[in-house]
Amino acid sequence: FYVSLLTDNSYPQALHADSQEKESNVQHIEEAQVNQVSSSDKPILLVVEDNPDICDYIAESFSDHFEVKTAANGKLGKESALKEIPDIIVSDIMMPVMDGNEMCRELKKDVRTSHIPIILLTAKDSLRDKEEGYQVGADSYLTKPFSASLLHSRIENLLQSRRNLANHFSANAAISNKAAVITESLNKLDNEFIHKINQLIEERLSSDKIDISYLSDKMCMSNSTLYRKMKALTGLSTNEYVRKIRMKHAEQYLLEGKYNISEIAFKVGINNLFYFRQCFKEEFGYIPSEYLKRLKETGEK
């Protein structure tokens, strides 16, 4: 009998399902791990206040738009912040056990929580008190008494600034441009954090084993803590960020013109050519060959 083989048929859907399924499974695992920390899709607001009336007032005012967590002093607030990794913290200053300034100082020097915006509340309005708050890393200051609308504006402004930074990460800007924005927008600890993450990825760029478990182990964080920090800083999950770094380097290799597509895919840790083309197209809008063609056409005009 005779067997006919179609030499030009790669059956991409059949051959490459494993790579896509693997990444999809990793993404689901990542999301499941962070859901163990937060049971809601709402951003988390941590209120640290020893006055029950003020605490209840803030919680009730923001419960429609935030998952509100509360703590009665700075020590409990710090513990809650490390557990929940909230999106923003509103804290009184004068509290028993640990005051708001000390809690702020402790959280801002811990890489797990250094990115979290903190608004300090105080009954004092002196310049010295405000200077002390900013010296320990507070992002904003609000004098009591205050209205819920004013607090809402402060919270929204801080979160919008963080979203703007995350949007810049998500955009298709050059890595060098991103680095400049990072340096200008983040505190020293968060700059070092992003630099370390990039270093860990780039050191093993050709490996397909870089995922949230590998990075969280190297950063000495739980998977959920790393996920929430990466999401807050970049707007991307950890594995999405890894893929974006791979694609940015793939673009650089492509523009150098020294390697063919298969070699580039291997150099950035993707051993499946079909999946590599798919990722590249998702990042830049075109598969690699079309991307080069478009660039050449643009340069000739």
Say what each PLM segment does.
Residues T70-I88:
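Acidic, metal-coordinating helix/loop segments flanking the phosphotransfer/catalytic sites
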Residues I212-Y241, A265-E290:
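Basic/polar phosphate-binding segments, predominantly the helix-turn-helix DNA-binding elements
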Residues A232-N271, R294-K301:
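Terminal helix-turn-helix DNA-binding modules in bacterial transcription factors
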Residues M95:
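Receiver (REC) domain active-site loop signature in two-component systems and cognate sites
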Residues F1-A32, R163-F169, T298-K301:
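C-terminal end segment of the histidine kinase catalytic
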Residues F146-I155, L159, N167:
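C-terminal output helix
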